[in-house]
Amino acid sequence: MHELSIAQSIVDVAGAEARRLGASSVRVVYLAIGRLSGIEPGALLFSYELVAADTPLAGSRLVIEDIPIAIHCAPCAAIHELPGVNRFRCPVCDTPSGDIRRGRELDITGLEIDDGASTDFDSIDHDTSALGASQAPEIPA
């Protein structure tokens, strides 16, 4: 269950950002999780509650945005979303493609801190490499 270590990394990264902002607690952590990330959202939510206890994130909640899989199709010269993880073929022309453009994400995208303010993580200088993002294996064409 790697979700426990991922939850710990989320608490570490979000807690560090909250401290940098001078916040004493965090109310909400916003995540973007790709369908190919290998993360089970239910297990992550359970693990997060455990590791967030007795930290400035205790009692906070995770809001998870599900990121669908998208591939690039060379013949169509377009990016297409896929309906699932078991068929990496262009939904328009049926060409196989392993050129995955979305779906591996594991990103903290924002925080709501104790004063009600929201922070967009894209505007912050932060390192989320500890989260283990994009560790899904390459899917051959």
Swiss-Prot record:
Residues that, per the record, bind Ni(2+):
2
Whether Ribonucleoprotein counts among this entry's keywords is no
Keyword set, alphabetical order: Metal-binding, Nickel, Zinc
Which InterPro entries does its entry note?
HypA/HybF
Among the GO biological process terms of this entry, one is:
protein maturation
User: What would be an example GO MF term here?
Assistant: nickel cation binding
Signal sequence annotation: none
Report any Pfam family annotated for this entry: HypA
Q: Coiled-coil annotation: which residues? A: none
Annotated positions binding Zn(2+): 73, 76, 90, 93
- Give the protein's function: Involved in the maturation of [NiFe] hydrogenases. Required for nickel insertion into the metal center of the hydrogenase.
- Give the family this protein belongs to, as stated in its UniProt record: Belongs to the HypA/HybF family.
Q: What is this protein called?
A: Hydrogenase maturation factor HypA
Q: Which gene encodes it?
A: hypA
